[in-house]
Each structure stands twice: as structure tokens, then as C-alpha cells.
């Protein structure tokens, strides 16, 4: 059985609507595949859905078989009719004029985590380390989601919820576990290889909005490595108006900045449609 829908989300199936799709279909007892132009992916992996590059007016087909296949197809149709939970059609992001601000310049660099490739532990011990670090990072994301909600920043809360789904992808853990088995490396080395490859896949997309998601993957890699390597990371504290200078900045870092003191952020890399830019705009 299958059902095809035409996507009406302005920015296609980016992280937030894709995470809604993953969550909804995960509740049904059925074997499912999503298909676009002959390419199929499992709906369990939000990253594989994103890499399909499902855009506005594209046709997406759900193929399902099993005890609850019919129910899954009905839910899929309802999701599409509801724009996968996006209540408003958002226009494509555009560069906006920035009002003049002043403050002391501070060059920010995230803490670097030292990653060793060779492991002295068993494969099972490294797998346990990786699962624990992922669990800690998922808890971090739940905390950031709650913080954003408490501040009335519902859009940002939805982004961190999407990050949670990005990280909680069984295919990522499976790929890292395979590396651990074959190369007998450390958990941090295996995880770094898997997420760097995923980041590069996003950067190679020709859709600007999806391409900018690489910074979300880099953010998740950094947060997980901090736990794996037990690296201490503290954001600098400012007591006077400051303008942050950086090559790039992680979305989760932006949320932790005090907008009453950090008056502006100037990046030499990044993208106007990155989550960091969205967070900065929301916090102004």
C-alpha cells in the first residue's frame, strides 16, 4: 500500500516538519519507506529524510505494509494536510538591516575537544560510553527546549526539539557502532567520523536552507564530544556591552548568551538561514 502527497511547506521538509513526521510514523506497527523520485529512505531517520531534499510542491510517497499500514497512511495524509505541524507558511529567510550597536569586541572560540583514535577499552565499553554521552546530550537539549519555552521562545524551543530528533537517530548510532567493531577505536573518534560525514552531506546539498543544517550537526557533535572527553566548557561572562566576533557559533551557545549584555554577533562564516542566525534574531 502507498499514498502520495504534494508538499506545501514553503521550506520543504526541513528539520521541524521532518521530526514531526518521524515521531508520528514511529507510533505505528508497520514496515515503511518514504520515496521521492525513485529514492527511498526509512522514516526512522530524520537525517535521511532531510537529505532527500523534499521541497515545496515535491511529491512524497509513503509505502507501508504490516498490521497498521492503513492507519500509518491515514496519519501521513493528515500530516501533509496540516503542513506537518507548521501552522504558518514562513517566507524564505532574507537578510535584514541590522541597527547600529556598540560595545567591546570579544573574539569567541568554542573549547576544543581532544579526540584520541586508539582505544584501550573493549568495543562494548566504548559503545556504552557513546550511548551515555548521547543520553547526556539529549538531556541537555531537553533542558534548552524547556528554557526556550519558559522564555516564550516557542520557535527556538521547536528547533531544539528538532535537534533532539536529529541526534536520536538510530542510523547514526548504528554507523558509529560499526566503526567501533571494525576499527577498535574510541567512541569519540567513531562518533566524530560519522557526524563529520553527515555534516559534509548537508553541505553538499544545493538547497540553501537544508545546506545550512550542517551547523546543527556540528553543534550536536561538539556537545557530545564535550561529554565523551569530559571537557570543561564555560561561556565567558560579560559585565559591559559586548559584540561577539566568531568564525561561527553554535545555536545552543547563542541561547545561553545574555541579550542585555551581548549586543551583537559578527560571524565570518555561517549562513543567514542557519539556526544561529534565527536564535540571534529571536533574542534581540
Tell me the role of every PLM-derived stretch:
Residues 1:
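Mid-to-C-terminal polyanion-binding domains and interfaces
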Residues 4, 11, 16-19, 23-26, ...:
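Non-catalytic, soluble scaffold/interaction modules
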Residues 7, 38:
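Generic anion/oxyanion-binding catalytic loop in active/binding sites
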Residues 30-33, 39-42, 51:
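Nucleotide-binding motor/catalytic cores of P-loop/tubulin-like NTPases across gene-expression machines
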Amino acid at each position: 500500500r502507498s499514498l502520495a502527497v504534494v508538499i506545501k511547506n514553503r521550506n520543504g521538509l526541513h528539520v521541524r516538519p521532518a521530526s514531526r513526521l518521524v515521531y508520528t510514523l514511529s507510533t505505528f506497527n508497520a514496515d515503511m519507506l518514504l520515496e521521492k523520485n525513485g529514492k527511498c529512505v526509512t522514516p526512522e531517520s530524520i537525517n535521511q529524510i532531510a537529505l532527500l531534499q523534499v521541497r515545496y510542491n515535491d511529491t512524497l510517497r509513503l509505502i507501508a505494509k504490516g498490521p497498521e499500514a492503513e492507519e500509518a497512511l491515514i496519519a501521513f495524509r493528515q500530516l501533509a494536510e496540516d503542513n506537518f505541524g507548521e501552522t504558518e507558511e514562513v517566507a524564505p529567510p532574507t537578510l535584514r538591516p541590522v541597527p547600529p550597536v556598540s560595545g567591546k569586541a570579544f573574539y569567541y572560540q568554542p573549547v576544543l575537544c581532544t579526540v584520541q583514535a586508539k582505544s584501550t577499552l573493549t568495543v562494548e565499553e566504548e559503545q556504552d560510553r557513546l550511548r551515555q554521552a548521547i543520553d547526556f546530550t539529549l538531556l541537555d537539549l531537553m533542558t534548552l527546549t524547556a528554557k526556550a519555552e519558559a522564555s516564550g521562545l516557542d520557535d527556538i524551543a521547536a528547533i531544539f526539539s528538532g535537534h533532539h530528533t536529529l541526534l536520536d537517530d538510530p542510523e547514526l548510532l548504528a554507523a558509529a557502532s560499526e566503526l567501533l567493531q571494525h576499527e577498535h577505536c574510541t567512541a569519540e573518534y567513531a562518533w566524530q567520523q560519522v557526524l563529520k560525514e553527515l555534516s559534509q552531506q548537508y553541505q553538499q546539498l544545493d538547497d540553501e536552507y537544508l545546506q545550512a543544517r550542517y551547523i546543527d550537526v556540528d553543534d550536536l557533535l561538539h556537545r557530545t564530544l564535550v561529554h565523551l572527553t569530559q571537557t570543561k566548557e564555560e561561556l565567558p561572562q560579560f559585565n559591559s556591552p559586548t559584540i561577539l566576533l566568531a568564525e561561527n557559533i553554535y545555536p545552543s551557545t547563542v541561547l545561553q548568551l545574555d541579550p542585555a549584555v551581548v549586543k551583537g554577533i559578527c560571524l565570518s562564516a555561517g549562513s543567514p538561514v542557519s539556526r544561529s542566525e534565527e536564535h540571534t534574531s529571536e533574542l534581540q
